[in-house]
Amino acid sequence: MKKQRKSQRFSGRVVYFRHILLFLYSSKLIMKLNIQNETARLKTVVLGRPESIGAAPMLAETYDAKSYHAVENNIYPVEKDIIREMNAFEAVLKKHGVEILHPAPIEGCNQIFARDVAFVIEDKLVASNLIQDREAEQDAYHHVFEEIKWSNIINLPKTAHIEGGDVLVWNDFLFVGTCYSEDYRNFKTARTNKYAIELLKEYFPQKRIIDLNLKKNDREPYRGVLHLDCCFNLVGRDKCIIYKNGFVDERDYRLLLDIFGETNCFQVTDQEMFEMFPNVFSIAPDLVVSDEVFTRLNRHLTEEWGIKVEEISYREISKMGGLLRCSTMPLIRE
C-alpha cells in the first residue's frame, strides 16, 4: 500500500512537472505580437542585417530610384559604412532596452530593410509578397516566424502585392500607400496593389483603412516615392511628418491634414524628402531615432513637440532607398 501511494505521488509529480515544462516551452515558443500603433514603447524588433550584401548592383539591377541615383553617380555605399551605421542604430535600441532579433544571414543578399518582408497589425503578422528581386530575403525570417502562433500569421495570395513600408498602423486607422496608375506593372517602385488593400479590409474589418495613391518613378528620386513611409510617418501621440508632393491626389494629403490637424503636421520640402526626413523611427511616443543631418526636423521634434531625439548617421544607407523605419520590423510594443 505504501509503495502504491509513493508511486502515485511520484506519478503526480511527474505529471505536474511535465505540465510546467510544457508551459515554459510553449511560452518561450509563442511570441505574443502586439502593434497597435507606430509609436508605443518598443519591446521587440527585427533589425535588418548589414553584412554580406554582395557587390553594388548594375544600373539595370536597381529597383528603386535612390539606388538608381547612387549607382548612376558612383556613390553607392560600401559594406563597411553600412555596418558602422547599423551598429550605431542597434546600440541606440539596446540602450533603451529593446530586444533585437536579426534575419539569418544570406550570402550576397541585401538584407538591410527588414520592414518590407512582413509587418504586424495588432496580434497578426502579415507576410509580404515582395517584388521578385527581393523574394530570397523572406527565407531568412523562418526562425522568427516559427516563434509565432501559426494562426496569427496571414499569408496573402501571390497576386496580392504588399510591403511593410506602405503600411502604417495608427490605433483605429490603417494608412496604406499604393499605386493606382495604369502603368503599375511597369514600375519597380509600385509595391502594394488594390487587391492587397481589399484583403486587409477583410482581415481587419474593425480598422478604418485609408488608401493613399503615391507618385512613382523608378529613376528620378525627386519625382516619386518608394513607400508611404518615405513621404508620411507618425510620431508622438497625434503628430506626423508629411511630404505633400508624394501624393498623386492632393485630396489624400488634405485628408491627412484633417485627421491630424495642420499644426500637428511637420511639412517636408523636396530636398528633405530626398534625404528621407519622414523615415525616422519611434522607440516610444517621446523618443525618436533620427539622422543627425535632419537639423530642422530634429529641432522641431525637440523644441516644438517635446520629443527626445537620438541622433545617428544613416547617410550611406539612405542612398539605397530606405532609412531607419525601413530597417526595422517591430513585433511587440506596449
Where are these regions (language model features)?
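Polybasic, lysine-rich low-complexity intrinsically disordered segments
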Residues: 2-7
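Short, Lys/Arg-enriched N-terminal segments with co-localized hydrophobic residues
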Residues: 16-30
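The feature marks the mature, well-folded catalytic cores of soluble enzymes
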Residues: 30-334
